[in-house]
């Protein structure tokens, strides 16, 4: 009944199993991938033909985590999985990016890839299994696809590269890098690092690419034994006559438009040129009795012509679209403290790209609690990236962040997290929001620069300035050019775009997307060296605006955090019965108080005086009474045989009638009254913490001559 095919191979320290032919047989392709108890099912379905009039490739990738994979039932009223988590969105993008360039040009049939996480080992992140599964499912499906694709995670511990490190190993790794590619070329890199050099980062890319050959070989074997016949598909024939006529009408117009340096003016000229060319081509066709060509077909030809013009100009050494050479970074302006009531803010402008970044400080209660499939955890640093449509002079939907915004926010967060102070040095939780107010390329890297400056403005003691730069690469045969600080137009016309962020000491985040084969290690080396040059220039501009070591003062509107350590056994004294003591403390002082199991008390208050008052009262509550020490006490209650005296809040003891005075005391009321302040010495304390007090002993200590003579 089943034509099940299984392939197993060793991949680093893990055994990987690929299975096809048993599950999801009606999909175009389906592969079950297992890595040490982490199991994913990857399926792909392609439509038999393209929708009429469609002029783009509709590829969708959905990575879906099921809570049953971790042996849990979802929370909430409906007890079902909800909308995609940030992790699911980011992993979907991670799979999409290296796969998309491997479909042939002109293939417009809808393709849907769905990856379900069926079982998860908390030590093995499912993302690598998902990437391998998507590649294998496409390969066995027979769909036109220039794969297979391999994927690997690379760590860096004690100067050694680690292939597919576990979650435990990643905690001590200086790098978390994911690389994907075919047998011939690297196609995608996504990484964060602890300020590592370009050489170490490139070495990790090459190491990962070499190791993933094991994956590619296993998929080839799987296709040989369990693959479906190749789908017969041929790219649509190019209308060479139409291409020639469009080029005849459009080339000069497009070249003229690309002499305009301002983005909005250039966009307007290009729009006019497109309209004129469409009209001229249509008029020529109808004048000879033919039908006007499809406008989308003309548009695609114009796009190809645009790319050819811009690319050839750059490769011939001519100025770029905005007049720069290949290495120059656009003019940078920086302003901090932009918004009066926020905790920190910075306006970072680079050419026609601008980010207004706001920092907000909070307490441990403000940390983001994340119920992840691999285990629940809290995150003290959040970064949210928003790009409204007005940033590009357009109208559009405003609302839930799209995949692109989530991805850009995650990249900026990766870049900054390595330079944040340790929690023990700065116990605040931090939220950064990057509002992109103008965009013409490299907005995620503007978020990195603006984010670092906003954090410094908020008083966060950053380890160093962090800057980011977006780079491009254009290659034609043996000629290539690396572009620093790319524009939006250069982004989609190039063969490789990559973003590098870091400090003067090294890289903290690296993202690469390569659209063609033939990008060698040497080319990547040149590109990374030029990116470093650009990053150092931007760091210099940031240093001028906010010199190192000049972290801003905390805003008057930010909470002040006071941290004290108490004996864990005293925690109950601060909390009180049913939380009565701590509730009264927070209400009376207007502060927020958090106590860890280890006895670390964090007091948060916008009013510094209120925070100090809360600290004083907690210290009183947790202070230990010392035997043999004299205290100023308050008489709380008179008894027939003595009095109850409070020596400090929550600490009272018995002053026996025999210890009130040197002479005989017949009535306690003759010597004491409730509320009276008296000096008492602590004689002893029993195992239940009860105190025995003495006024006589205190008097003798204050005035030895008054002590009774033996």
Swiss-Prot record:
Its cofactor is Mg(2+). The keyword Repeat does not apply. Its main location: cytoplasm. Keywords: Cytoplasm, Magnesium, Metal-binding, Nucleotidyltransferase, RNA-binding, Transferase. One of its GO terms (biological process) is mRNA catabolic process. One of its GO terms (molecular function) is polyribonucleotide nucleotidyltransferase activity. It is an enzyme of class 2 (transferase). Residues 559-618 form the KH domain. It catalyses: RNA(n+1) + phosphate = RNA(n) + a ribonucleoside 5'-diphosphate. The keyword tRNA processing does not apply. Mg(2+) binds at residues 491, 497. InterPro entries: ExoRNase_PH_dom1, ExoRNase_PH_dom2, ExoRNase_PH_dom2_sf, KH_dom, KH_dom_type_1, KH_dom_type_1_sf, NA-bd_OB-fold, PNPase. It is found in: Cytoplasm. It comes from the Bacteria. GO terms for cellular component: cytosol. Residues 628-696 form the S1 motif domain. Its EC number is 2.7.7.8. Belongs to the polyribonucleotide nucleotidyltransferase family. HAMAP family: PNPase. Involved in mRNA degradation. Catalyzes the phosphorolysis of single-stranded polyribonucleotides processively in the 3'- to 5'-direction. This is Polyribonucleotide nucleotidyltransferase. It comes from Herminiimonas arsenicoxydans. The lineage of its organism: Bacteria, Pseudomonadati, Pseudomonadota, Betaproteobacteria, Burkholderiales. The gene is pnp.
């Amino acid at each position: 009944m089943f034509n099940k095919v299984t392939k197993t191979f060793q991949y680093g320290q893990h055994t990987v199993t690929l299975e096809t032919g048993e599950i999801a047989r009606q999909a175009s392709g389906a592969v079950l991938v297992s890595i040490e108890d982490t199991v994913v099912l990857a399926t792909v379905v392609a439509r038999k033909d393209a929708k009429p009039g469609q002029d783009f490739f509709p590829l969708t990738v959905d990575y879906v985590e099921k809570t049953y994979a971790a042996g849990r039932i979802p929370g909430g009223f409906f007890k079902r999985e909800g909308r995609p988590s940030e992790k699911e969105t980011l992993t979907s993008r991670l799979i999409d990016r290296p796969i998309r360039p491997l479909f042939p040009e002109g293939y417009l049939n809808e393709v849907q890839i769905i990856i379900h996480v069926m079982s998860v080992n908390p030590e093995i992140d499912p993302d690598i299994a998902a990437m391998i599964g998507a590649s294998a499912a496409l390969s066995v499906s027979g769909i036109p696809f220039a794969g297979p694709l391999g994927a690997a995670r690379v760590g860096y511990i004690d100067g050694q590269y680690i292939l597919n490190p576990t979650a435990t190993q990643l905690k001590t790794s200086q790098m978390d890098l994911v690389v994907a590619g075919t047998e011939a070329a690297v196609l995608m890199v996504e990484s964060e690092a602890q300020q590592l050099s370009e050489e170490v980062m490139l070495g990790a890319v090459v190491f990962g690419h070499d190791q993933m050959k094991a994956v590619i070989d296993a998929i080839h074997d799987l296709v040989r034994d369990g693959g479906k016949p190749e789908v017969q598909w041929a790219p649509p024939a190019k209308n060479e006559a139409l291409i020639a006529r469009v080029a005849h009408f459009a080339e000069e117009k497009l070249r003229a438009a690309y002499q305009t340096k301002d983005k909005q003016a250039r966009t307007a000229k290009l729009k006019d040129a497109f309209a004129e060319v469409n009209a001229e081509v249509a008029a020529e066709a109808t004048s000879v009795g033919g039908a006007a060509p499809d406008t989308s077909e003309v548009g695609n030809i114009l796009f190809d012509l645009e790319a050819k013009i811009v690319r050839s100009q750059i490769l011939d050494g001519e100025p770029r679209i905005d007049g720069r050479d290949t290495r120059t970074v656009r003019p940078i302006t920086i302003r901090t403290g932009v918004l009066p009531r926020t905790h920190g803010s910075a306006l970072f402008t680079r050419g026609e790209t601008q980010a207004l970044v706001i920092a907000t400080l909070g307490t441990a209660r403000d940390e983001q609690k994340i119920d992840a499939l691999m285990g629940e955890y809290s995150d003290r640093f959040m970064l949210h990236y928003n790009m409204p449509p007005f940033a590009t002079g357009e109208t559009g939907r405003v609302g839930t962040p799209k995949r692109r915004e989530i991805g850009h926010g995650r990249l900026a967060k990766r870049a900054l997290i390595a330079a944040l102070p340790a929690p023990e040095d700065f116990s605040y939780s931090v939220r950064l929001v990057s509002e992109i107010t103008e965009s013409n390329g490299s907005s995620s890297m503007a978020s990195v620069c603006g984010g670092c400056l906003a954090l410094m403005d908020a008083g966060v003691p950053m380890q160093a300035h962090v800057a980011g730069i977006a780079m491009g690469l254009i290659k034609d045969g043996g000629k290539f050019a690396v572009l620093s600080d790319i524009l939006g137009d250069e982004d989609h016309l190039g063969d490789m775009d990559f973003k590098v962020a870091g400090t003067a000491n090294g890289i903290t985040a690296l993202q690469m997307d390569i659209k063609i084969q033939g990008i060698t290690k040497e080319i990547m080396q040149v590109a990374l060296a030029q990116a470093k040059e650009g990053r150092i220039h931007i760091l210099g501009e940031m240093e001028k605006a906010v010199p190192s070591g000049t972290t801003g003062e905390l805003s008057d509107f930010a909470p002040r955090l006071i941290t004290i350590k108490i004996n864990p056994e005293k925690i109950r004294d601060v909390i009180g019965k049913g939380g009565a003591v701590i509730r009264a403390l927070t209400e009376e002082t207007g502060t927020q108080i958090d106590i860890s199991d280890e006895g670390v008390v964090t007091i948060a208050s916008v009013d510094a005086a209120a925070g100090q008052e809360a600290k004083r009262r907690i210290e009183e509550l947790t202070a230990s009474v010392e035997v043999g020490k004299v205290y100023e006490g308050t008489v709380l209650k008179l008894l027939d045989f003595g009095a109850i005296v409070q020596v400090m809040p929550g600490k009272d003891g018995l002053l026996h009638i025999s210890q009130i005075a040197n002479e005989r005391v017949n009535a306690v009321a003759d010597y004491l009254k409730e509320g009276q302040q008296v000096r008492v010495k602590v004689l002893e304390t029993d195992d239940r913490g009860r105190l025995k007090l003495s006024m006589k002993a205190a008097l003798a200590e204050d005035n030895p001559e008054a002590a009774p003579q033996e």
